[in-house]
């Protein structure tokens, strides 16, 4: 017996997946998803894999997660959407991918539309 529980194993896998999303390592992240990791998995703050990829500007990772069925409007515990995060960080390619996939620019608090107005992002 190794002394490591299934719960601890899953926690380590989840943390690795969150790091992969945050750093834009798309191929490795998608191997986790293809092996059965929930595409809408969230961390302790309610940030999904998609939210982390969007907030850190990884458009290819965002597109891959969307292709795997990620919820483009899933908000975190602070009611922030992936689209609002991308707008806040001024990641136009990420925002475009989310909008193309049907993300709601009025979802969340503040919404992506409100965030764009606050920061003069006239591209939304």
Language model segments and positions:
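Intrinsically disordered, low-complexity regulatory segments in ankyrin-centric signaling systems
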Residues: 1-35, 44
């Amino acid at each position: 017996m190794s002394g490591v529980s299934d719960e601890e194993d899953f926690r380590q896998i989840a943390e690795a997946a969150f790091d992969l999303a945050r750093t834009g390592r798309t191929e490795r992240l998608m191997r986790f998803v293809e092996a059965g990791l929930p595409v809408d998995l969230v961390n302790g703050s309610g940030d999904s894999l998609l939210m982390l990829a969007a907030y850190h500007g990884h458009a290819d990772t965002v597109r891959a997660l969307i292709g795997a069925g990620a919820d483009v409007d899933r908000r975190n515990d602070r009611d922030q959407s992936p689209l609002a995060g991308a707008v806040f960080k001024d990641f136009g390619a990420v925002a475009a991918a989310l909008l193309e996939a049907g993300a709601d620019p009025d979802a969340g608090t503040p919404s992506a539309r409100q965030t764009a107005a606050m920061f003069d992002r006239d591209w939304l």
